[in-house]
Amino acid sequence: MVFSSNVLEHVPDPMGLIEEMIRATRPGGLVYLSYTNWYSPWGGHEMSPWHLLGPRYAERRYIKRYQRKPKHEVGANLFRVHVGPVLRALRARPDVEIVAARPRYYPRWCRLLLRLPGLREVATWNLMLIMRRVG
């Protein structure tokens, strides 16, 4: 099993990380991936929810309130990762089977949110994926 929790949004090449996780997994093995997506209320981490009005605005607001820069800087150690593109990329791969996909921290029935393209980006605070490497 290869495991990553709340790391994906902190790397400049999220799809590259996913690719490497799958590559490092034996056939039949599992990949666990969870991440906070950008459009969720917590996508801007400590600058949330103000990141939804733009990262520069969120940073200025944070500095004004706390008199210091935030720990995360969009484009340096926090990157915009979305639910739809990740799901589409994984579904298109012949070497991966998605075993489970649902919003983490929510009841299981909330996995239905992932079927609603616009809503899933905002309502899925943290996406949890379990994948099996095929072949």
Residue spans for each PLM region:
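A short His-aromatic
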Residues: 6-10
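S-adenosyl-L-methionine-dependent methyltransferase catalytic module, highlighting the catalytic core
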Residues: 12-20, 24-26, 30-129, 134
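A conserved beta-strand element that flanks and buttresses the S-adenosyl-L-methionine
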Residues: 3
